[in-house]
Curated annotation (Swiss-Prot):
GO molecular function list: ATP binding; proline-tRNA ligase activity
Top enzyme class: ligase
SMART domains xrefs: ProRS-C_1
Function of the molecule: Catalyzes the attachment of proline to tRNA(Pro) in a two-step reaction: proline is first activated by ATP to form Pro-AMP and then transferred to the acceptor end of tRNA(Pro).
PANTHER family: BIFUNCTIONAL GLUTAMATE_PROLINE--TRNA LIGASE, PROLYL-TRNA SYNTHETASE
Protein name: Proline--tRNA ligase
Family, per entry: Belongs to the class-II aminoacyl-tRNA synthetase family. ProS type 3 subfamily.
Length: 514
């Protein structure tokens, strides 16, 4: 292992935060923009988002939802109707107050004092309130329910400390909003969408997650219940990768979303909302990346196979290109994971080794080099991103299949890469969860022994509320810890709460988090 020369100069073990930024740069995913806290998502990064979007959109539509689009501007009065909701977002809201600019007489521009809006407009931080207005118009009777909608959009939350893909002032996401006749139906739908997120994360992104309910202090502003999927990054921190909220009638009462039931009575709807964002890409980086850059699971890779002809600006280049074109033509007729194999023939000029490492850093699942000798021998030089190195020689672990062999095996190879990435991440996650913690002192010692990657701790607690919960939160805050969620389908605890000493009623995960 010591004689392997990795592609990145910054190593995960040395500086995880710097390594994360290096992967984004070297994989050419995104860059900082001229607007503080906002990023430019570049073609490879946006291609990954498009794959995530397509796969998740199919799952959302399979559960009966239809896509809509609402304005990015929301009247301030919409938020004022829901006090708890606006309090949760007030410090992050960007507000438009004028509709015109004028010259300042010195070559600059200023808002025109005569063009002040009658009512300020909030730049969308989330859309419960504006969806609520529409639901109040669209829903009249029980026949209009359930109303199942989803929106793909950008949102703005003015963050003070930003990090690309994890926390930016503007980001891309989907947000679902639904209305139901009863609490039971709405709660069931909340969990249905949580399961959609779990399946998407694990099956498409190869991210092992824990699904569960958030504690009272971590609920979405205005929600009755908030559920999340939590993933463990390679530094042991938790990443909240998606949330699903049961909102009760809180937003319905604020927006007057009512329906006439079968008996002719008038009732408030029970609503839900749920969302995931480009934060998922940050999760992919920190779960699967290594000291050679990004590794993209095949299901979300814009290109699953990249073919690199070793062109030398010689007459034989034409024959080599034809050989590569023929290989590409055969591969794209094959199906893998229910879709045609996505193949790029990279004909850009450049040295073979430089182009290879460019695609290794980007995380393309399979990189194929084809030179004149490969063509003469009727083979290709294949490199799997998940099996990059020959441990004994310290050199790239090239394989040499024939085009026919590759065509026959491409689907199973991509399946193997996808399954292997999930398995590796799941094994690592499970190995870094501490169970059997029976006291707060034991928890404190676990996070105070100087280890870099201490993972999560599973503990029993009594589900305190109010001031008692606030004391727990403060004790954890001193250790830079938070309660992640209450995992679903766990056996009933038999011990005592490590925070209050009372009989435990639930298991929870505690961790440092992004």
């Amino acid at each position: 292992m010591s004689n392997i020369r990795h592609a990145l100069t910054v190593k995960r073990e040395d500086d995880f935060a710097a390594w994360y930024q290096a992967v984004i740069a070297e994989a050419d995913l995104a860059e900082e923009s001229g607007v503080r806290g906002c990023m430019v998502i570049k073609p490879w990064g946006y291609g990954i988002w498009e794959r995530i979007q397509r796969l998740l959109d199919d799952r959302i539509k399979a559960t009966g939802h239809e896509n809509v689009y609402f304005p990015i501007f929301i009247p301030l009065s919409n938020f004022e109707r829901e006090a708890e909701h606006v309090e949760g977002f007030a410090k992050e809201m960007a507000v438009v107050t004028h509709h015109r600019l004028i010259g300042d007489g010195e070559g600059g521009l200023i808002p025109d004092p005569e063009a002040k809006l009658e009512e300020p407009l909030v730049v969308r931080p989330t859309s419960e309130t504006i969806f609520g207005d529409a639901m109040a118009r669209w829903i009249q009777s029980w026949r209009d329910l359930p109303l199942l909608t989803n929106q793909w959009a950008n949102v703005v939350r003015w963050e003070m400390r930003t990090r690309m893909f994890l926390r930016t002032s503007e980001f891309l996401w989907q947000e679902g909003h639904t209305a139901h006749a009863t609490a039971e139906e709405a709660k069931e739908h909340t969990l249905t969408m949580l399961e959609v997120y779990r399946a998407h994360a694990e099956e498409d992104l190869a991210l092992p997650v824990i699904a569960g309910e958030k504690p009272e202090n971590e609920r979405f502003p205005g929600a009755v219940e908030t559920w999340s999927i939590e993933a463990m990054m390679q530094d042991g921190k938790a990443l909240q990768a998606g949330t699903s909220h049961y909102l009760g009638t809180n937003f319905s009462e604020a927006a007057n979303i009512k329906f006439q039931d079968r008996e002719g009575g008038e009732k408030y709807c029970h609503t839900t909302s749920w969302g995931v964002s480009t934060r998922m890409i940050g999760g992919v980086i920190m779960t699967h990346g290594d000291d050679d850059g990004l590794k993209v699971p095949p299901r979300i890779a814009p290109y699953q196979v990249v073919i690199l002809p070793m062109l030398r600006d010689k007459p034989e280049d034409d024959a080599l290109l034809a050989y590569c074109e023929d290989l590409r033509g055969k591969l794209i007729t094959e199906s893998a994971m229910g879709e045609p194999v996505r193949v790029l023939l990279d004909k850009k000029p450049g040295k073979a080794a430089a182009k290879r490492w460019n695609w290794v850093r980007k995380g393309a699942p399979i990189v194929i080099e084809v030179g004149g000798r490969d063509m003469e021998n009727g083979v290709v030089s294949l490199l799997r991103r998940d099996e990059l190195w020959n441990e004994e020689t310290g050199k790239p672990a090239f394989q040499a299949p024939t085009p026919a062999q590759l065509t026959d095996e491409i689907a199973s190879m991509l399946d193997s890469i996808q399954a292997g990435m999930f398995g590796t991440a799941q094994t690592w996650r499970n190995a870094n969860v501490m169970s059997g913690c029976t006291s707060f002192e034991q928890l404190r010692d676990h996070y105070s022994d100087g280890k870099k990657h201490v993972g999560w701790v599973e503990v029993q607690w009594s589900k305190p509320t109010g001031q008692e919960l606030e004391k727990v939160v403060e004790k954890l805050k001193d250790l830079k810890l938070t309660i992640r969620n209450v995992p679903m389908d766990t056996p009933a605890p038999t011990g005592s709460c490590i925070f209050t000493g009372k009989p435990a009623v639930e298991w929870i995960y505690v961790a440092k988090a992004y």
